[in-house]
């Protein structure tokens, strides 16, 4: 007899679907409504509990409701040995979709994502929060009618960069250890400078080039220790010029990265300028905002291919049947 695992008497736990910056994530079901949910579990005994902070950040971001691109917290509490948080179940991550599409995205898809990603970070920053773990795994697509919306998740490493009431900025510091994912973190993060708004935006720039190029020059570097690997990534990132990184792609991508790298610690980024860079390029390329992403086309193509294969199989079976029927017609 299988035991049904429940959370808060409202949610049923299903299969594991991933891991976050801290803890594991499971698919679940709202028992009352039947709606699918995501359930994040973290051991109570963990050295640095993060789930309570993360739930608090989600609640700050969702205050007032009706927020686009931020999942809702449906429950947060302690269940036995685990801290638990239940949020809306979303679609696949941009990393998953990047892999699904052959590990390269078109300019059109990248530009449709870019504007939404910048808008999400702009909103997070407007609530006095920086994310500090910008990577394709932490941007997810919605489901159903919201399937074209980009969501930002995983606030396990997030931090307030200013007082929400007075807007007093946190002080500049050096000698900080690396927080985030080395592949996408800013050069200033590598050299130990306290993170601020500029660093989240620089990370988005690296994600966009990763999508267009298929990889980044500092991927796959070998090292004996994590610290040595971080140092090698930092060195390659600093010695690869923006122009080299963005070569053969529209100038707007180099302009984006040069702008984010030019910002000072407390600067408020000009998000409108950054979104406009990509929106104007999108229009100039003759694209339309139809939300037909590369994965939309690939799914249609794969479905058509499957349909053709099924059709061919049916035709072959029909021909074989006709052949056997003709054999039956001949007298022995």
UniProtKB/Swiss-Prot annotation:
Names of required cofactors: Mg(2+)
Keyword Isomerase: no
Catalytic reactions on record: L-seryl-[protein] + ATP = O-phospho-L-seryl-[protein] + ADP + H(+); L-threonyl-[protein] + ATP = O-phospho-L-threonyl-[protein] + ADP + H(+)
Amino acids binding ATP: 17-25, 40
The keyword Cell division belongs to this UniProt entry's keyword annotation: no
EC number: 2.7.11.1
Catalytic residues identified in the record: 133
Effect of residue 133 to A: Abolishes protein kinase activity
Description of the deletion phenotype: RNAi-mediated knockdown in the bloodstream form inhibits cell population growth and leads to gross morphological changes and multinucleation. RNAi-mediated knockdown in the procyclic form inhibits cell population growth and decreases ZC3H11 phosphorylation.
SUPFAM superfamilies associated with the record: Protein kinase-like (PK-like) (SSF56112)
Superkingdom classification of source: Eukaryota
Temperature dependence: Optimum temperature is about 27 degrees Celsius. Loses activity at 41 degrees Celsius.
Region named Disordered: 306-332
Keywords of the record: ATP-binding, Kinase, Magnesium, Metal-binding, Nucleotide-binding, Serine/threonine-protein kinase, Transferase
GO biological process per UniProt: regulation of ubiquitin-dependent protein catabolic process
Sequence ranges of Basic and acidic residues compositional bias: 322-332
Xref: InterPro entries: CK1_Ser-Thr_kinase, Kinase-like_dom_sf, Prot_kinase_dom, Protein_kinase_ATP_BS, Ser/Thr_kinase_AS
GO molecular function, one term: metal ion binding
Function: Serine/threonine protein kinase. May phosphorylate ZC3H11 during unstressed conditions, leading to proteasome-dependent degradation of ZC3H11.
Family to which the UniProt record says this protein belongs: Belongs to the protein kinase superfamily. Ser/Thr protein kinase family.
Name of this protein: Casein kinase I isoform 2
């Amino acid at each position: 007899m299988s035991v049904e695992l429940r959370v808060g008497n409202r949610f049923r736990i299903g299969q594991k679907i991933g891991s976050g910056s801290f803890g594991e994530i499971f698919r679940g079901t709202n028992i009352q409504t039947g709606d699918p949910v995501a359930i994040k579990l973290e051991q109570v005994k963990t050295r640095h509990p993060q789930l309570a902070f993360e739930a608090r950040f989600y609640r700050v971001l969702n205050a007032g409701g009706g927020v686009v691109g931020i999942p809702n917290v449906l429950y947060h509490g302690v269940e036995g040995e685990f801290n638990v948080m239940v949020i809306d179940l979303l679609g696949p991550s941009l990393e998953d979709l990047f892999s699904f599409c052959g590990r390269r995205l078109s300019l059109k898809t990248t530009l449709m994502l870019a504007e939404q990603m910048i808008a999400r970070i702009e909103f997070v920053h407007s609530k006095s929060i920086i994310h500090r773990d910008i990577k394709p795994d932490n941007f997810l697509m919605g489901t159903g009618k919201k399937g074209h919306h980009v969501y930002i998740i995983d606030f396990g490493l997030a931090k307030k960069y200013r007082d929400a009431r007075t807007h007093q900025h946190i002080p500049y510091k050096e000698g900080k250890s690396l927080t985030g994912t080395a592949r996408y973190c800013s050069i200033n993060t590598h050299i130990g400078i306290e993170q601020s708004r500029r660093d989240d935006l620089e990370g988005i720039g690296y994600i966009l080039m990763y999508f267009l190029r298929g990889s980044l020059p500092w991927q796959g570097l070998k090292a004996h220790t994590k610290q040595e690997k971080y140092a090698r990534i930092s060195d390659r990132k600093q010695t690869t010029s923006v122009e080299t990184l963005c070569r053969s792609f529209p100038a707007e991508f180099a302009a984006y990265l040069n702008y984010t790298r030019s910002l000072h610690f407390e600067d408020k980024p000009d998000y409108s300028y950054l979104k406009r860079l990509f929106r104007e390029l999108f229009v100039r390329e003759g694209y339309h905002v139809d939300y037909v992403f590369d994965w939309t086309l690939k799914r249609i193509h794969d479905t058509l291919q499957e349909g053709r294969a099924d059709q061919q199989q049916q035709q072959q079976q029909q021909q074989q049947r006709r052949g056997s029927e003709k054999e039956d017609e001949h007298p022995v």
